[in-house]
């Protein structure tokens, strides 16, 4: 009892209770909201579903057989204790609830957009084949700190995917920074009729990389060559850009710089336009690229098993939440309890978004072969 006579229950203590008693938990679940939150935090921090499931079963006193199993064909299977379906179901059901409690529903003033792809091994293909891609957006709030504001897995990166992604939130950003190509072109189409339309800015790091890759191979490897300093400074002012152009033009007479000359010529109007714009806001998609590198380390080894779009999106939201510094076991447990209270204790039905056999939602489906009549 509190001082004003209101009865309270501790949501964190875990005493041994009768089967009809216990801590707040989703109906028909054998685990409490606190344990679900603990599992979600572990997954957000990069733990696998299997390791998380084994830990949760152990700490709750619900261990399963920890001996390796074999299938009917003799294939070695993971122990039942490590079966990850338990945690995978929780991620699908509760990750969107956690994300919606923190993430903004509107685009911020400054926005970074880009995509990255995940590949899987394929016999006969040295680089494997593309499994799926991830679209990402980092926004800058009033404190000018970058935060992931949207992330989505797609089977293929095309204009339709980017249009749906950029229309997923309300509002219009004031500045959109991208590597160029499809993301910025689609942003121009989506936001062009908004008033005022956003400024579109090419990422300076990608522009510099394009220039560097156009150099002869030996010059690319020689980081002491003066031209690398000129490239680094080229986007700071019009005279710096002209100095780089003059140096490339001078070297063209010796051979091997034709590609660099074409590149610096084609990028000149882009750089000139950006130099004429206000200097406010980010100039690189670096914060988003950093998140993509972390994703590659976390999801790369299991990309071949990620075939369901809804579940992949839920996992991405947890990983993004951790990147934003939102992971908090106690706060997440409170969010889950509040959600369950509103739903009379019922969590959303698990496995609502299963794929039909042979039609994984996170894979590019093969084009149908025309049949002659």
Show where each model-derived region lies:
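Conserved beta-strand -> loop -> alpha-helix junction used to position metal-binding or nucleic-acid-contacting
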Residues: 176-182, 186-227, 289
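Short helix/loop capping segments that flank catalytic or ligand/cofactor-binding pockets
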Residues: 18-21, 51, 120-122, 185-187, ...
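RNase H-like nuclease fold core
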Residues: 8-9, 15-19, 62-178, 183, ...
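Basic, short loop/linker segments at the boundary and entry of helix-turn-helix/winged-helix-like folds
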Residues: 1-42
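Short, charged amphipathic recognition helices of the HTH superfamily
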Residues: 45-58, 184, 241-244
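Acidic/histidine-rich catalytic cores and adjacent linkers
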Residues: 35, 171-174, 181-186, 225-373
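Short basic-aromatic helix/loop recognition motifs at nucleic-acid
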Residues: 40-47, 281-283
């Amino acid at each position: 009892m509190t001082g004003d006579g209101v009865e309270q229950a501790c949501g964190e203590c875990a005493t041994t209770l009768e089967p009809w008693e216990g801590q707040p938990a989703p109906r028909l679940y054998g685990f409490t909201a606190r344990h679900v939150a603990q599992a979600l935090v572990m997954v957000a921090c990069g733990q696998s579903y299997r390791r998380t499931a084994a830990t949760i079963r152990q700490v709750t006193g619900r261990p399963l057989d920890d001996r390796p199993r074999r299938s009917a064909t003799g294939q070695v299977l993971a122990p039942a204790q490590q079966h990850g379906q338990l945690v995978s179901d929780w991620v699908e059901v509760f990750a969107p609830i956690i994300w919606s409690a923190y993430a903004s529903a509107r685009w911020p003033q400054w926005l970074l957009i880009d995509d990255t792809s995940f590949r899987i091994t394929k016999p006969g293909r040295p680089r494997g084949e593309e499994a799926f891609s991830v679209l990402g957006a980092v926004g800058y709030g009033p404190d000018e700190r970058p935060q992931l504001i949207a992330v989505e897995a797609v089977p293929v990166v095309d204009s339709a995917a980017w249009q749906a992604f950029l229309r997923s939130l309300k509002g219009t950003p004031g500045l959109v920074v991208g590597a160029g190509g499809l993301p910025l072109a689609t942003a121009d189409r989506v936001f062009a009729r908004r008033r005022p339309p956003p400024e579109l800015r090419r990422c300076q790091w990608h522009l510099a990389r394009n220039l560097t890759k156009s150099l002869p191979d030996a010059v690319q490897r020689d980081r002491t060559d003066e031209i690398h300093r000129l490239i680094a400074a080229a986007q700071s002012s019009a005279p710096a850009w002209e100095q780089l152009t003059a140096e490339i033009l001078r070297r063209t007479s010796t051979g091997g710089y034709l590609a660099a000359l074409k590149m610096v010529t084609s990028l000149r109007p882009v750089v000139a336009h950006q130099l004429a714009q206000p200097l406010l806001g980010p100039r690189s998609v670096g914060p988003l690229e950093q998140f993509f590198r972390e994703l590659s380390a976390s999801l790369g080894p299991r990309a071949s098993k990620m075939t369901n779009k809804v579940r992949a999106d839920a996992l991405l939201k947890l990983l993004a939440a951790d990147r934003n510094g939102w992971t908090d076991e106690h706060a997440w447990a409170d969010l889950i309890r509040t959600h369950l209270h509103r739903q009379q204790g019922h969590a959303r039905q698990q496995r609502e978004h299963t794929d039909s056999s042979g039609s994984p939602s996170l894979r590019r489906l093969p084009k149908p072969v025309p049949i002659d009549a």
